[in-house]
UniProtKB/Swiss-Prot annotation:
InterPro entries: Ig/albumin-bd_sf, LPXTG_anchor, LysM_dom, LysM_dom_sf, Octapeptide, Protein_A_Ig-bd, YSIRK_signal_dom. PROSITE patterns: GRAM_POS_ANCHORING, LYSM. This is Immunoglobulin G-binding protein A. Important immunodiagnostic reagent because of its ability to bind the Fab and Fc fragments of a wide range of mammalian immunoglobulins. Belongs to the immunoglobulin-binding protein SpA family.
């Protein structure tokens, strides 16, 4: 019964289909049933692809197939959605099969071959490339930078300037290990600063160099040598100048000049370099026997203070030396200074040898000098000089010089200071006091007087002073009158002359 029903239905279906087909042929159209029966190629293709998408689950696959059945006209859209969902659900391991673009592939290859990245760093960069291929260039740049920063120190590739700096710093002898390593690390961190780092390293190396190893330029070396040999600098001064030379060699000339100036200022007085005229005066004054130490030192100090007046100072010193010379050293008897008294050696004393007979001089009789009586000189009585009384000089009282007696007034209450005079000497010679003279002349310091200065003196010389000078005019032999001695010598000379004359007559 059941089979009959099925058969009847089939027959009915065939009949209906036949009628429909006939109708379509007559009317020239296609019925919806015929359209649904004939799936186009797009639907079939979509149906096939959806069935083979590995990443869709059963529900997703059945849903897409049902949609294809429900509306075959949407086959292309349904297939696109199915592919998108399938790709999004693809396993990670399968993502390596993605076709990377050219930049991504290059970055991927370079990162895999970077030797200084560890596995974690390398995998991180590769994952970044997979996640966003559009950032391949940036990811590769970061990977390179990290790879270079982690490169072993010995493997760093320095450019030419960096290599030169690296080599020089390694061979700087005055840097310690910490300083050397610091400069090398700075070179690695920023090679572009190689020149600046090398300059700093050189400066530090030179500043720490041992003193004997410093390389001075020619001017600096000369200054260094001269300062070391300046004898009047102490150690502190010498070391100070040498340190200044090291700190700033450009100032070598100025520093040497300062050092020389200080050396000269500290030179011992005896070592001063006087010019020729000054040296001569210095030598002569040192050997003037009649100067006191105070006078000698005063003249020497004057020479040092003003070498240009060396001649004048020497003349004053000689004059003072002569004035203070002992009487016996003036070739005069005590109290005289003209070499005219008998007993002198000026070709006037009887018995002298001037290619003349004994006792005679210049055709004069024995005992006479220049047609004058024995004991006289130039028409003066014995003991006189130039028409002056015995012991006088140039019309002055005994013991005077140049018309002024040392320590005595000029007869008008004024004393002219001579070289070597002191206020005390002047006061003593004039019977007054130094304080009185200082007060009368308003002297700020009674020890400060100079040759040629005029001083007012109130008191005259004591009367007994002239008598003492007269006594000094006598010869040191104790004779009261030189005329007797002269007469004796004259008589002997006459006798000797007569004997010689008689002998010559006999020969004739």
């Amino acid at each position: 019964m059941k089979k009959k029903n099925i058969y009847s239905i089939r027959k009915l279906g065939v009949g209906i289909a036949s009628v429909t087909l006939g109708t379509l042929l007559i009317s020239g159209g296609v019925t919806p049933a015929a359209n649904a029966a004939q799936h186009d190629e797009a639907q079939q293709n979509a149906f096939y692809q959806v069935l083979n998408m590995p990443n869709l689950n059963a529900d997703q696959r059945n849903g897409f197939i049902q949609s294809l059945k429900d509306d075959p006209s949407q086959s292309a859209n349904v297939l696109g959605e199915a592919q998108k969902l399938n790709d999004s659900q693809a396993p990670k391991a399968d993502a390596q099969q993605n076709k990377f673009n050219k930049d991504q592939q290059s970055a991927f290859y370079e990162i895999l071959n970077m030797p200084n990245l560890n596995e974690e760093q390398r995998n991180g960069f590769i994952q970044s490339l997979k996640d966003d291929p559009s950032q391949s260039t940036n990811v590769l740049g970061e990977a390179k930078k990290l790879n270079e920063s982690q490169a072993p120190k010995a493997d760093n590739n320095f450019n030419k300037e960096q290599q030169n700096a690296f080599y020089e710093i390694l061979n700087m002898p005055n840097l310690n290990e910490e300083q050397r390593n610091g400069f090398i690390q700075s070179l690695k961190d920023d090679p572009s600063q190689s020149a600046n780092l090398l300059a700093e390293a050189k400066k530090l190396n030179e500043s720490q160099a041992p003193k004997a190893d410093n390389k001075f330029n020619k001017e600096q070396q000369n200054a260094f040598y001269e300062i070391l040999h300046l004898p009047n600098l102490n150690e502190e001064q010498r070391n100070g100048f040498i340190q200044s030379l090291k700190d700033d060699p450009s100032q070598s000339a100025n520093l040497l000049a300062e050092a020389k100036k200080l050396n000269d200022a500290q030179a011992p007085k005896a070592d001063n370099k006087f010019n020729k005229e000054q040296q001569n005066a210095f030598y002569e004054i040192l050997h003037l026997p009649n100067l006191t130490e105070e006078q000698r030192n005063g003249f020497i100090q004057s020479l040092k203070d003003d070498p240009s007046v060396s001649k004048e100072i020497l003349a004053e010193a000689k004059k003072l030396n002569d004035a203070q010379a002992p009487k016996e050293e003036d070739n005069n008897k005590p109290g005289k200074e003209d070499g005219n008294k008998p007993g002198k050696e000026d070709g006037n004393k009887p018995g002298k040898e001037d290619n003349k007979k004994p006792g005679k001089e210049d055709g004069n009789k024995p005992g006479k000098e220049d047609n004058k009586k024995p004991g006289k000189e130039d028409g003066n009585k014995p003991g006189k000089e130039d028409g002056n009384k015995p012991g006088k000089e140039d019309g002055n009282k005994p013991g005077k010089e140049d018309g002024n007696k040392p320590g005595k007034e000029d007869g008008n209450g004024v004393h002219v200071v001579k070289p070597g005079d002191t206020v005390n000497d002047i006061a003593k010679a004039n019977g007054t006091t130094a304080d009185k003279i200082a007060a009368d002349n308003k002297l700020a310091d009674k020890n400060m007087i100079k040759p040629g200065q005029e001083l007012v003196v109130d008191k005259k010389q004591p009367a007994n002073h002239a008598d003492a000078n007269k006594a000094q005019a006598l010869p040191e032999t104790g004779e009261e009158n030189p005329f007797i001695g002269t007469t004796v010598f004259g008589g002997l000379s006459l006798a000797l002359g007569a004997a010689l004359l008689a002998g010559r007559r006999r020969e004739l």
